[in-house]
Structure formats: structure tokens, C-alpha cells
UniProtKB/Swiss-Prot annotation:
Residues 1-73 form the HIG1 domain. Pfam families: HIG_1_N (PF04588). It comes from Scheffersomyces stipitis (strain ATCC 58785 / CBS 6054 / NBRC 10063 / NRRL Y-11545). GO terms for biological process: mitochondrial cytochrome c oxidase assembly; mitochondrial respirasome assembly; regulation of proton transport. This is Respiratory supercomplex factor 1, mitochondrial. The chain crosses the membrane at residues 10-27, 40-62. Residues 62-120 form a coiled coil. One of its GO terms (cellular component) is respiratory chain complex. Associates with the respiratory chain complex III/complex IV supercomplex. It is found in: Mitochondrion membrane.
Length: 131
């Protein structure tokens, strides 16, 4: 209620003015002052009309603001999605670099083992021939 009152301050003021007009009309009716009673009831109608106009105008303004808020919210969500996508791509690139490094080291290890095996076979062959 307090939040709505801050968003549309004219509506609660109109409601208070309408209530005041009704109270004054009731008091003047109790005293038998017919003319004043009529005047207060006319004030009540005017205050209710002002309150209603303020309520409708506030609703229209809130709709426009909420459309703008929705647009900014969608923009923020798009930006957040772009950031997530960028982070994901960076993570994939990092993982790919690790995989490529592992493959390179594996190939180096294989080449080294193959070289060592060939040297070992050569030594065995040389030792066999030398006997």
C-alpha cells in the first residue's frame, strides 16, 4: 500500500479528500443544513472524479514505464547471455589448448620411445653381429 502510494500520490490524496467530504456531508446532514450537505456531496463527486482520473493516468504511466523496464530487462538478459557465451567460448578454447598440448606431449613421448627402442635394437643387433 505504501509503495503504491509513493508511485501514485494523487490517488490516496483524492481518497482522503473524498472521505473528508463525506464526513462533512454527514455532519451537516445531522445538523440539518441541507444546502451545505448538497455542497459537500458535490465536492465528493468532484474528488472521486479527480481520484479516478489520477488512477487511470497513473495506470497508463505505469504501463509505459513497465514497457521501458521490460525493454531494459531484456537488454540486460541479452548482455548476460553474451557474457556467458563469451565465457563458454573461452573455456572451450582453454580446454582445446590443453588437449592440443597433451597430444603434442604424447607425440613427443612416442617419438622418444620409438627412438629409444630403435637405438636399443641397433645396440642388440650390433652386439649380436660383434659376437
Amino acid at each position: 500500500m505504501v509503495i503504491r502510494s509513493k508511485e501514485q500520490p494523487v490517488v490516496p490524496l483524492g481518497a482522503l479528500a473524498t472521505t473528508g467530504a463525506i464526513i462533512l456531508a454527514a455532519r451537516s446532514m445531522k445538523r440539518g443544513e441541507k444546502l451545505r450537505t448538497q455542497v459537500y456531496f458535490r465536492y465528493r463527486v468532484v474528488f472521486q472524479l479527480i481520484t479516478l482520473v489520477a488512477l487511470v493516468a497513473g495506470g497508463v504511466m505505469m504501463q509505459q514505464e513497465s514497457a521501458e523496464q521490460k525493454k531494459t530487462r531484456e537488454d540486460k538478459l541479452r548482455e548476460k547471455a553474451k557474457q556467458r557465451e563469451k565465457l563458454w567460448i573461452e573455456e572451450l578454447e582453454r580446454r582445446d589448448a590443453l588437449i592440443q598440448e597433451r597430444k603434442r606431449r604424447l607425440e613427443e613421448s612416442r617419438a622418444e620411445l620409438k627412438k629409444m627402442a630403435e637405438e636399443g635394437f641397433k645396440q642388440e643387433n650390433d652386439n649380436s653381429k660383434g659376437k
